[in-house]
Amino acid sequence: MSESSVLIVFPNQLFKNHPGLKAEIKKIVIVEDSLFFGDISFQSNFHKQKLWLHRASMKNYASWLKGKGFEVHYQEHSKKSDVLFSVLKKLKSEKSLKLISCETHDYELNRRLRNHTHKLSLKLEILSSPMFLNTQEQNSDYRNGKKRWFMADFYKFQRKRLDLLMDGDQPLGGKWSYDEDNRKKVPKNLHSEIPKLSTFRRSATEQEAVEYINLNYSSNLGKLEDLIYPTTHSAAKKWLDDFLNNRFSLFGDYEDAILKGENWLWHSVLTPVLNIGLITPEEVIGAAKKKAHDNNVPINSVEGFIRQIIGWREFMRATYVDCLLYTSPS
């Protein structure tokens, strides 16, 4: 890699093992991109808790990188200008010759990144991302020649490809899906035993994010109360462990249950930390496999959870890329 290579990190790329960290980079620029905070062209009134999660997790990531010895620059969001273009223009003026980034997993962000770097004559290298288990090439190879595009078919392909819950070439237990066993109502005798989500003592960084969002996004939806989401790699790992230890075994039975006054029941609530990169699907699957093996977790819980990660999540990403449709970052 060139000495003047710069790694750019977006809000959904906070990977502990970011592939760009292995490169010979001059510095790292973390960008509060407008597509995640508020964009002029794609106007969205993002919930304050989403904005808080991005701000706090990105600030924590910057501190973590500095602790690793990297030179880190943090670019805040601007409501009036194209922050990404401004960052790239500055890098160009500093004689940065090459920009390194992970796959963005967002059509519009990818389009802008490529257009801006081309306009500024900046070399751009896109690295594979650990955000998903499948590569685009694997999904395309599977998709080619298929007359129909159903999640159930894709899920079987995934189970076989990843050798998960398989007995030879057949599904473990004799069924590909235990969805019919995931629709029980929560009995009254369990109402008082629904596990509570673990909580964290909020850090100074997280409190700064509360004040910053309230000050700069006061008219946005929501309130910054009862904040539950992890904002560091270690907290995300504890969040996963809490699910596996306290909710995993009954997840299958009550996966589709709805109970007034209960927001979480036995769900993992891993989507936010997965979607910003604080934890990866590979880590989640590895930990779930070990927990299931060591503790004889019911197969309807194991299969139901695995299906969400390797099935639905990967299928929706493949569908998004295949259709080339724009949706706002989640």
Task: Label each region the model flagged.
Residues 74-82:
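Short beta->alpha junction loops
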Residues 310-324:
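Conserved alpha-helical segments that form or flank metal/cofactor-binding pockets of metalloenzymes
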Residues 10-17, 84-89, 111-112, 257, ...:
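Short alpha-helical segments and helix-capping/turn motifs at coil-helix boundaries
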Residues 162-305:
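Glycine/tryptophan-enriched, flexible segments
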Residues 2-73:
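N-terminal beta-strand-loop-alpha-helix module at the start
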Residues 83-229:
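Beta-rich, aromatic/charged-enriched effector core domains that present basic-aromatic interfaces
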Residues 326-330:
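Conserved small/polar residues in nucleotide/adenosyl-binding loops
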Residues 15-17, 36-38, 81-82, 107-109, ...:
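Flexible loop/turn segments at secondary-structure boundaries
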